[in-house]
Design a protein with these regions (language model features):
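Sec-dependent N-terminal signal peptides
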Residues: 1-6
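Short, well-ordered surface patches within globular domains
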Residues: 23-91
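C-terminal motif of bacterial Sec signal peptides marking the signal peptidase cleavage site
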Residues: 10-13
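Bacterial signal peptide processing site
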Residues: 15-17
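A well-ordered secondary-structure block
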Residues: 77-169
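Second-shell loop/turn segments in exported
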Residues: 19-26, 41-49, 65-67, 99, ...
């Protein structure tokens, strides 16, 4: 059997309605996951989830749209759809998203964290951050799952993440 066949067979035995843990799509995704787990310290490592990856991708699309966000249209509608059914996912803010007020009631989404090749360095930079309530969420032992999306914005590579306490139930 090939390595992929062994993985497929082992995942097939997982059963239940929950989605199987995702494998990092790129080496950069793997580095971000490693950095987040370094930031968490002694807490159990986060598991990458493909459904939450979709939610993180939708958050990145909001940043990439580069449009002012007002109260009229829910820019986060697709991200909200992607987290439906995840345990308490709606209670957590996307990590790596900065909302800057451009005028009263109007905001512009911007990326917050640069993706780097060194996971240890990224983890140390996260530990040095202060005043980011979204990042502080990772200190909760209740948070178990994460979705990550790495993207290009301007001349740099950034990442965003979405977390939940548990997977979708059947």
């Amino acid at each position: 059997l090939t390595g992929a066949a062994v993985v497929a067979l082992s995942l097939a035995g997982c059963g239940g309605g929950a989605s199987a843990p995702a494998v990092p799509a790129t080496p950069k995704d793997a580095k971000v996951l490693e950095a987040l787990n370094l930031y968490r310290g002694k807490l159990s490592p986060l598991t990458l989830d493909s459904g939450l990856n979709k939610a993180a991708e939708e958050v990145a699309k909001i940043i990439l749209s580069n449009k002012p966000l007002g109260e009229s249209k829910d820019a986060f509608a697709e991200a909200h759809k992607a987290i439906l059914g995840y345990k308490n996912a709606e209670l957590y803010q996307p990590i790596g998203l900065s909302m800057n007020e451009v005028s009263e009631g109007t905001y512009k989404a911007a990326p917050r964290y640069v993706c780097q090749d060194d996971a240890k360095l990224m983890g140390e930079q996260l530990m040095a951050q202060t005043g980011d309530p979204a990042l502080e969420q990772l200190k909760s032992p209740l948070v178990k799952l994460v979705g990550i999306h790495v993207f290009e914005y301007g001349s740099a590579t950034y990442w965003v993440a979405v977390v939940a306490e548990g997977g979708k139930t059947a």
